[in-house]
C-alpha cells in the first residue's frame, strides 16, 4: 500500500501508546513477613480497572451523536464535545458521526453534515476533519458489509463536505495518490468526483440530496400551530394540546403559539376561556417560558394596527386580556413592558422602522449612498441608529449577495459620518439577540451575521476588541455567542481581509496590490491631461467603494510629487458625485498623515502641502472641521 504519512497522525498514535496505562496494576503485599525467605513472590499482580481515555471518549461520543440525532441541537452537541476535552481524538468523532449517519435515514445524514459544518474550525480543526474522512475511506470496505451502498453514501458525504468548504477540493487528488486503485476507498473518490461534483449546478444538487435543511420551515410550523389550536378549541383537551406543543420541538418559537392563540381569541370570543387556560397551564408546566410569553404578547401589540383592519375590536380585546394574564401570574408585567418598548412600543419607533425600511429598499434599487444618508438625516432620530443598522442587515440577509455587499459598503460609509462606534455595537447586539428568531426566516442567519461582523472589523467599522464587548452582552451559550466565535474565526483566517472584502462579490477578485496599481495608472492618465468625467467613471468601474481611501491617498501623494493641485479637482468631483464618501476621504487623508515622515524624505515640503490640502478639504466639506485639529496635535 502507498504511504499514508499524509493521512495518519503518527505523533498522535505514539502519544496514545505512551499514555495508555498498563492493563494490570502492581500491588505490594505488605501482610507477608519478608524477613523469611518463603520462596513466595512478595508482589502480586491483581486485576484493576484502568482508565483508558480513548475507550471512554468512544463511549461518550456515541452518546453525544445519538442525542444529537434525536434533538438536532447543534449547540448542545458542540458544547458536549468541548466538555469531553481530549480534542486529539476528534478525527474519531468525525469518522463515528458519518459512519453512524450512513446507516440511518436522510434526516440523520443531513444532520451529520450540518453538525460537521458548524463544528469546523471552532471545535474540530480542518486537519482533524480531513483525517476523519481519510479513516472513513480506509474503512469503507468494512462499512460496506453492513451498509450495501456505503461507497455511494460516503462519496456523497465527501462531496457535501467539499461543497460546504470543510474539505478542500484538492482532498480528492491527494486521496487518489495514496489509496490503492483496487480499494473501495478509491472508488468512493471516483464516485464523488464524477457523479456529484462534476454535474451542472452540483452544489445545489448535493446540498438538497438528503432533503436540504433539517429544520422545519416557518410556514409549516405556523400551520401545525394553527391546526392544534383549532383542534384544542373544538375538544378542550388541554393535556393533548400541551403534548402537541412538546412534540413541535421549537421552544424558541413558542411566542408564535402565544400570538396565534391571542389572535384566535380576537377572531372568536368564545375561545377565550380555553386559550387563556392553555397558555396558563403551558407556563406552569414550563412548556412556554416567561420570555416567550412576553415576546408573544409584544408581537400582538406590534401588529394591533393591522389586526384592527379585520377585527375592529382587536385593541380593546387585547387590552382586556393583558391584565388577566398578569393577574393570573403567567405574564410578567416588567418583561412585557420592556419588550414592548424594545420592539417598537412607542409610536415614534414604529414610524421610524417603517420609514427606515422604505429608504433601505430604495437604496437597494438605486445604490445611491449620498441620497440614503440624506434620507436618514431627514428622519432626525439619531437615537434609533442601532435600530436602523439592525433593519438594514436583516433586510440584506434576506436578499442576494449584491444587497449584502451594498449593506456592508453603506455601514462603512456611515462610520464616522453619522454613526458612533456605540451605535454599531448596540445594533449588532440587537441583531445577535434576535438571531434565533431571524433564523426561522433566514436559515443561514447565524453564518451571514458572522460575515457581517467580520466584514465590519475588516472595514474598520468595528475594532476587534468591540467583538469582545458585544460578546460580553450575550448569554455564554447562545446563538449570538456562537456567531461571535465564527466571526473571530473568519477574521483570523489566512488572507482574511481579501477574502472578506470579496465574500459577497464586492471585490473584483484582484489582489490588493493589483487594485493599487490600477488606481495609480488611472490617476497618472488623468494627471497628464485626462478628462475628469472619464477618471470618475474609471474609479466607479473599479467596483471597490470600500477601497476608495486608496484613491484619496494616492491622489494626494501624486499632487505633492508632481506639484500639481489638479488632483484636488478630481477629489472634489468624486465627492460631489458621491463616489468618495467623507469616511473614505477621512481614511485616505489619515493614511497620508501617518506616512508624512517617510514622504518628507523625498518631498521636503510634504507636511506643508498636506496641511494646505486638509484646509482645502475642510473648506469644501470633504472632511470634518476637527480633522485639522487632530493633525496639528
Swiss-Prot record:
Residue span, MI domain: 56-177, 220-341, 351-472, 514-633
The keyword Chloroplast belongs to this UniProt entry's keyword annotation: no
GO biological process, one term: response to carbon starvation
Key words, A-Z: Cytoplasm, Nucleus, Repeat, Translation regulation
Null mutant phenotype: Increased susceptibility to dark and starvation, and to treatment with the TOR inhibitor. Decreased translation activity associated with altered ribosome patterns, especially in the dark and starvation conditions, in which mRNAs distribution is altered and rRNA abnormally degraded. Slightly early flowering time under long-day conditions.
Tissues expressing the protein: Mostly expressed, at low levels, in rosette leaves and flower buds, and, to a lower extent, in roots, stems, cauline leaves and flowers.
Complex formation: Binds to EIF4A1. The association with ribosomes is modulated by cellular energy status and TOR activity.
Name of the protein described by the UniProt record: MA3 DOMAIN-CONTAINING TRANSLATION REGULATORY FACTOR 4
Record organism: Arabidopsis thaliana
Amino acid at each position: 500500500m502507498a504511504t499514508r504519512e499524509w493521512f495518519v497522525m503518527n505523533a498522535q498514535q505514539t502519544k496514545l501508546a505512551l499514555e495508555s496505562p498498563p492493563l494490570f496494576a502492581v500491588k505490594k503485599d505488605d501482610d507477608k513477613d519478608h524477613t523469611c525467605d518463603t520462596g513466595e513472590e512478595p508482589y502480586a499482580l491483581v486485576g484493576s480497572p484502568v482508565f483508558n481515555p480513548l475507550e471512554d471518549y468512544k463511549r461518550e461520543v456515541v452518546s453525544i451523536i445519538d442525542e444529537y440525532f434525536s434533538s438536532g441541537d447543534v449547540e448542545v452537541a458542540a458544547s458536549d464535545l468541548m466538555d469531553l476535552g481530549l480534542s486529539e481524538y476528534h478525527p474519531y468523532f468525525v469518522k463515528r458521526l458519518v459512519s453512524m449517519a450512513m446507516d440511518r435515514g436522510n434526516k440523520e445524514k443531513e444532520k451529520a453534515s450540518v453538525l460537521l459544518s458548524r463544528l469546523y474550525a471552532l471545535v474540530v480543526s480542518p486537519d482533524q476533519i480531513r483525517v476523519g474522512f481519510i479513516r472513513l475511506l480506509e474503512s469503507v470496505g468494512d462499512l460496506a458489509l453492513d451498509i450495501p451502498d456505503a461507497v455511494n453514501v460516503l462519496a456523497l458525504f465527501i462531496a457535501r463536505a467539499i461543497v460546504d468548504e470543510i474539505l478542500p477540493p484538492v482532498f480528492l487528488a491527494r486521496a487518489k495518490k495514496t489509496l490503492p486503485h483496487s480499494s473501495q476507498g478509491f472508488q468512493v473518490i471516483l464516485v464523488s468526483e464524477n457523479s456529484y461534483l462534476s454535474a451542472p449546478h452540483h452544489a445545489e444538487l448535493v446540498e438538497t440530496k438528503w432533503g436540504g435543511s433539517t429544520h422545519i420551515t416557518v410556514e409549516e410550523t405556523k400551520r401545525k400551530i394553527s391546526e392544534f389550536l383549532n383542534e384544542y378549541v373544538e375538544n378542550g383537551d388541554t393535556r393533548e394540546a400541551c403534548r402537541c406543543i412538546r412534540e413541535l420541538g421549537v421552544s424558541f418559537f413558542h411566542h408564535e403559539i402565544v400570538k396565534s392563540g391571542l389572535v384566535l381569541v380576537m377572531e372568536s370570543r368564545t375561545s377565550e376561556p380555553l386559550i387563556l387556560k392553555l397558555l396558563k397551564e403551558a407556563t406552569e408546566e414550563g412548556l412556554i417560558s416567561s420570555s416567550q410569553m412576553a415576546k408573544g404578547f409584544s408581537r400582538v401589540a406590534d401588529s394591533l394596527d393591522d389586526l384592527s383592519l379585520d377585527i375592529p375590536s382587536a385593541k380593546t380585546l387585547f387590552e382586556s386580556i393583558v391584565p388577566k394574564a398578569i393577574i393570573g401570574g403567567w405574564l410578567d408585567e416588567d418583561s412585557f413592558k420592556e419588550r414592548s418598548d424594545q420592539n417598537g412600543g412607542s409610536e415614534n419607533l414604529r414610524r421610524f422602522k417603517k420609514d427606515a425600511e422604505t429608504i433601505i429598499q430604495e437604496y437597494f434599487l438605486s445604490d445611491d449612498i449620498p441620497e440614503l444618508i440624506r434620507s436618514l438625516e431627514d428622519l432626525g432620530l439619531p437615537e434609533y441608529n442601532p435600530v436602523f443598522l439592525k433593519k438594514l442587515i436583516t433586510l440584506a440577509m434576506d436578499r442576494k449577495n449584491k444587497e449584502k455587499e451594498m449593506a456592508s459598503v453603506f455601514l462603512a460609509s456611515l462610520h464616522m459620518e453619522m454613526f458612533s462606534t456605540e451605535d454599531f455595537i448596540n445594533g449588532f447586539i440587537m441583531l445577535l439577540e434576535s438571531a434565533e428568531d431571524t433564523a426561522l426566516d433566514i436559515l443561514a442567519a447565524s453564518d451571514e451575521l458572522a460575515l457581517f461582523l467580520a466584514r465590519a472589523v475588516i472595514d474598520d467599522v468595528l475594532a476587534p476588541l468591540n467583538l469582545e464587548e458585544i460578546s460580553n452582552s450575550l448569554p455564554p451559550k447562545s446563538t449570538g455567542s456562537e456567531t461571535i466565535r465564527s466571526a473571530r474565526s473568519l477574521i483570523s483566517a489566512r488572507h482574511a481581509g481579501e477574502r472578506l472584502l470579496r465574500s459577497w462579490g464586492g471585490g473584483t477578485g484582484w489582489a490588493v496590490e493589483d487594485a493599487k496599481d490600477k488606481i495609480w495608472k488611472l490617476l497618472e492618465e488623468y494627471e497628464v491631461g485626462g478628462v475628469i468625467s472619464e477618471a470618475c467613471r474609471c474609479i466607479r468601474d473599479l467596483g471597490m467603494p470600500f477601497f476608495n481611501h486608496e484613491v484619496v491617498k494616492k491622489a494626494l501623494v501624486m499632487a505633492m510629487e508632481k506639484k500639481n493641485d489638479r488632483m484636488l479637482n478630481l477629489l472634489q468631483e468624486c465627492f460631489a458625485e458621491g463616489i468618495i464618501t467623507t469616511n473614505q476621504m477621512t481614511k485616505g487623508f489619515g493614511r497620508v498623515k501617518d506616512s508624512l515622515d517617510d514622504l518628507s524624505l523625498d518631498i521636503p515640503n510634504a507636511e506643508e502641502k498636506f496641511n494646505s490640502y486638509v484646509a482645502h478639504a475642510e473648506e469644501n466639506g470633504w472632511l470634518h472641521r476637527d480633522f485639522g485639529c487632530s493633525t496639528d496635535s
